Amino acid sequence: MCRHTHIGFVQGSDTFWSKSNYVAGITHNVLGYATQLTESDFVGLHLFYMDSGDMDVTTVEQPNGFGETFSVTGLSLRGIYTKILTDRLKIGFSIKYLREQIYTTYMQSFVVDIGSNFDTGIYGMVLGMSVSNFGPQVEYKGEGLEIVVDSDLDPDEKLSRITEKFSLPLTFRLGVKNDIIGPNSEFMNMGDMHKLTFAMDGINALDYTVYGTMGLEYTWNNMASVRMGTHLGHDTAGMSFGFGLDYNRIVLDYAFVNYDVLD
């Protein structure tokens, strides 16, 4: 579902933090904050940081390293605005700063994401849509592209390689959500005690094949949740499982995703 309009469901203010241990020692870290300005206006900040962990710097002459290390890092900082247009339609957009660094080489840019969330009124179906990474082409720069040359070629005895510009992966996402059981369900209304939600997304990133995700979440008494889902058409990701606890506005979530050959 559309992430840009999620803050339109905030009551008051919310803070979110998440850490994911990925393959090969890579970590994904997320920090978010959202607040309601008026009955129909919401703003938020979202920080994502990826760190590969330290790796040895190697050369052809010293393939086992020589004591120096480097890391690959990725940073995404978004400012988000969401507007409730009607009781069924929310729209949102974000301005995002991106930076990726490999040792002493980096690329950075500003891009825009847009999205919407629409309650169809048809059997409780809610549709979400987003388009991400509208922006200019980017290229890598930095000291890592410099090579040492003879002073006859350059007085500073170094030249910088010119890298080719490329487009960021424009990504289209379309999702649907339905409360099969719950206070808003068109099928089985059991109050707030039991809630079962089905969600499915289709994702089309221009640098990858089309794939999808689908899952179920059962929530008991608005306090404890269990979840399961799967990826469709993804080359490595498979089933996922998770649970959540919500007590006095403090929420704890845990999830496990099977990446098959990457285990």
Predicted regions and their residues:
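Subset of outer-membrane beta-barrel
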Residues: 1-263
